[in-house]
Amino acid sequence: MKKNVLTYTVVALIILAACQGNQPAPPANTGLPADAAAIMAERGLTQDDAYAALKTYIPSGKTDPYIMFASGGQGGQVLAIGVPSMRILKLIGVFTPEPWQGYGYGGSSDETLQGGDMPDGSPLRWGDTHHPNLSETNGEYDGQFLFINDKANARLAVIDLRDFETKQLVKNPNSINDHGGAFVTPNTEYVIEGPQYAAPLGWEYAALEEYQDKYRGLITFWKFDRTKGRVDPAQSFQIELPPYWQDLCDAGKGVSEGWFFCNSFNTELATGGVELGNPPFEAGTTKNDTDYLHIFNWKKAEEVFKAGNVEQMNGIAVIRMETAIKEGILFFTPEPKSPHGADVTPGGEFIVVGGKLDPHVTIYSFEKIKAAIDGGGLETDGYGVPVIPLDKSMEAQVELGLGPLHTVYDDKGYAYTSLFLDSAVARWSLGGAYAKLHPEDPWKLVQKLPVQYNIGHITAAEGDTASPDGGYVVALNKWSIDRFANVGPLLPQNFQLVDISKTGDQMKVLYDMPIGMAEPHYAQIIKADKLKPFEVYPEVGWNPETMSVDPNAITDASQAKVVRDGNKVEVWMAVVRSHYTPERVEVNKGDHVIWHFTNLERTRDATHGFALAGYNINLSLEPGETQTIEFDANKSGTFTYYCTEFCSALHLEMIGYFLVKP
């Protein structure tokens, strides 16, 4: 009977969804099953609600066709979210310790976090994640790696999507913060980290009165070794820039491959000081009518780096600004003031820029940019950088509304731009080769869809690749206000799923998703079938750090042992449902303890935990995983260790004693 009611309900929803308009549910006498009609009437559901329910519903046991990776903002993490169900699948620990995964509480993850510490060794244990970027092959997501930046501390993270774990953190030695990162070149040759606020290189002290002379911008091209799954600083380089505040970036592809584009603001070179009677930064950095779109020939920069025409600074190669100008690496063109988004179209023909204080988006033609560069004779800015006149680089402008920011694309020749002040998603028609894909005239606003509220970033299904999928856009709204139950003054963010499957003005909001543990910025949506994660680690004894069998792994509980060598005690422990071997470990106060764990399980989802009371140690051991912790037994007493992951009916019995003699 229950199955029949569910079937009738779904059929009823389909019938209702086929209707047009935003009308209340029909009464029971329409022929619908009474249960279905009653449910809809009781809940006050409309036909649009029924349509949205069908578009987002994933039956139990089924999986989403897409996965979205969203930054966690000042939470320092990454969220993996199913689309269209909008279900959180995983929180990935990145720059901040995360106890559920045992990230940062012993084991190899401690070493990963230490890799992102300050050059003097000072620990950094939180981050402000902003822009995740998936690895690409030929401008398409390949599902192998994910990169993300830490704006607060100018760091880059590498996440291996075989196990959804962070493998490397890299601290930028010459920038103190960043924003335009992480962005990849079309074959992930480089992961680009753009700067944000100008500072002396290496963040050395210099008075703000010396701003124009001693402060600089800096963009970093981190070389990525795909085989090792690591950034290689020795093969990476940086380009010195004027002290404008560089912002978001995007790599050229297709016809513009080999080039790179970044926004900037504060071409006024404002230094603030409202307490001194100076204009505040928000006024001082917005006086000019335009700022500068930065245009990089990164292929040429790579040649200059390989030729050795660089300076070494704090362990990394730097192409000085004078060299970048002389070698034809760096160019500018005016862009709308206070821009926030430089987004390359799928074929690389155009770059779209939204200026927060201009109701238009400005579309730049790469063909025109290249022609202006090749033609020469360009005037320069105050630092000698060639500036392409706007009329020599611009293809079109489209008036969209207030506060345009970021732009993504679909498979129908449309662009989608977030409008922060209007709280709307703007759909507009592209020109050029894209005009044949949609029925509208090129470069026209098609629809403005209200969203709730103050949308910042926007993402679409594979929407910044060489071949976007269409179907869905997600509005990453900064304010939720009244959309969810009141949980106190700190409110969740609101991700809204938008249906873009139909042409014209048929966009619809399908779903509101509260994000109550993060303040996400950018996100990317990948086809789920491009991801090939492990179900269990390939072999018993697998080290997630090296992605190989650990030399200290054991393959059977009979190999478990405790060995003392002077004041060093080394433990090889087997972990399996529902016990540890050994269950007693006894040491002396002051001993140095090295403890190896191997989860012997080969069953999917048979994860075990290890929590050692009093010593701030907490591990998550996935099936087949080996981990090692190392610490000094500096507290005498009786301490328990137990499995934190509910693994079996006798989960509570999976414990042991760590005895430390005075």
Annotate each predicted stretch with a short phrase.
Residues A52-Y57, W100-Y105, L124-T137, N174-V184, ...:
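Repeated scaffold domains used in trafficking and secretory/extracellular systems
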